[in-house]
Amino acid sequence: MSLSLWQQCLARLQDELPATEFSMWIRPLQAELSDNTLALYAPNRFVLDWVRDKYLNNINVLLNDFCGMDAPLLRFEVGSKPLVQTISQPAQSHHNPVSVARQQPVRMAPVRPSWDNSPVQAEHTYRSNVNPKHTFDNFVEGKSNQLARAAARQVADNPGGAYNPLFLYGGTGLGKTHLLHAVGNGIIARKPNAKVVYMHSERFVQDMVKALQNNAIEEFKRYYRSVDALLIDDIQFFANKERSQEEFFHTFNALLEGNQQIILTSDRYPKEINGVEDRLKSRFGWGLTVAIEPPELETRVAILMKKADENDIRLPGEVAFFIAKRLRSNVRELEGALNRVIANANFTGRSITIDFVREALRDLLALQEKLVTIDNIQKTVAEYYKIKIADLLSKRRSRSVARPRQMAMALAKELTNHSLPEIGDAFGGRDHTTVLHACRKIEQLREESHDIKEDFSNLIRTLSS
């Protein structure tokens, strides 16, 4: 019996679990087999508890399948084992909301002198820029951002570990910046003298230009390559800035070699960033890449309720649902609308009711209703799937037509205030039960298929922009 037993388990788990789950929870585990005990090491308590709660039975079943009566006992521990083990990763589609580079070994025991042993370097004054108001505690979690939050939490607990770099991507106002600051605050809480630097990518460019003008490029390099964690927002703004990309390429390599944490955000998947060198885009995907989706209705309601609570405002549930059903694109838009409602209520002394909200947000709501119509949804979906609008309205039942039709119906329910019968009528006079079935089918497929989930998110972004 040897570690090949765990490798067999890994191979089976890769086949049995969704790629996202395997990448997030199973891949970071390290294994040690001795005295008929298989010890699995998790990078932190969060991962340990999750794996033990969700996958303990799966692993025990596999051990019994492979070993029968000789199956080893299973033990979980937090920590790392001084061993590097490379496992074969499944091919990742660029449409996957979570991807981990195939060519990278699992880093079993990173040596992190900057985290554990090094004194604080006094040669620079570090501009942390981490906003203490953005933490994991006040980040509202939902299906749309659950994986991103979990990955960020793990990085905060174990910087420089398996998820380095961490790349978060998604549309504007979905919480990427909040998570960057939350990671920074988490690292600083763990080690107050850690050198954590947050910045927008344009600040990196500005600093480099200033260093070139002042003949201080070596000082620039020392500054950025000696941080413990570098958090860069909107990396897509490096596009077509060749000298900045060159400098960041070498900075990236230096930080990764030193097991210093890198977290990047963008509005698109790394390989889809135009104007950025392929060697950089490749490195962006070396660690963990996670998408943040537009928030679903329940998460939008939770965001509004939490924001109101932070402002000591009582927001009736029906009012929160009214706003959330009509403003769907991003968190920033939701919070801006609520701030407007609160300000109007404070100025007028009126209670916050649905009628009051309808009046306070009348121009915003009118704009939303004008932007997203069933006709617009049908046109956008037809163009996306390269079919005719007439196909969506027809009685054709081939998958190439039926699936886009179901997608369009689900989007109409999500993005408009039309009833199911009204939506059915707009799709060739179909019954409301057909619309309900379509919505449930798309919801199911979004859980099972990365491509369907990505299609849904792309269409939401297109229709909401």
From Swiss-Prot:
Domain IV, binds dsDNA: annotated span: 346-465
Q: Where is this region: Domain III, AAA+ region?
A: 129-345
* Segments for region (Domain I, interacts with DnaA modulators): 1-84
Which Gene Ontology BP annotations are present? DNA replication initiation; regulation of DNA replication
GO cellular component terms given for this protein: cytoplasm; plasma membrane
> Which family does the record assign?
Belongs to the DnaA family.
Record protein name field: Chromosomal replication initiator protein DnaA
